[in-house]
Design a protein with these regions (language model features):
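Flavin-dependent oxidoreductase catalytic cores
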Residues: 1-133
Length: 133
């Protein structure tokens, strides 16, 4: 995330080289002073990616602090964006999963560390999304 031109060049090259959909997973930015995801999302879409997954923390944060879904929602609600936006970060309960869909409008959520030792979390979330229970 410190060399965006190179990132975009590589992304374009991969999209052009393969016959399958290319997706990207990235973070909000490098650090709190460089949250560039709104602009970067548009640039990645222009490279021809099929979907974008956004982790709600910066690279500097790693896994500390809370994921900031505000910018994920901003990307999703950008009228220029037409690819699926997948949110990631701190989706640890079925209720939080539903909130991410309802509040931020994402097309999907990606579950990461919350599934470690809890592989049944996916079934729980699916059930909650379908029934509210």
């Amino acid at each position: 995330m410190q060399n965006i031109p190179q990132m975009l060049e590589i992304t374009r090259a991969v999209v052009d080289a393969v016959k399958i959909p290319v997706t990207v997973k990235t973070r909000l930015g490098w650090d709190a002073n460089n949250k560039i995801i709104v602009e970067l999302a548009e640039q990645l879409q222009d490279c021809g990616i099929a979907a974008l997954t956004i982790h709600g923390r910066t690279r500097a944060q790693m896994y500390t602090g809370e994921a900031d879904w505000t910018l994920i929602g901003e990307v999703k609600n950008n009228p220029r964006m037409h690819i699926p936006i997948i949110g990631n970060g701190d989706v640890t309960t079925p209720q939080r999963c539903k909130e991410c869909f309802d509040r931020y409008g994402v097309d999907a959520v990606m579950i990461g560390r919350a599934s470690f030792g809890r592989p049944w979390i996916f079934k729980e979330m699916k059930h909650y999304l379908e029934t509210g229970e």
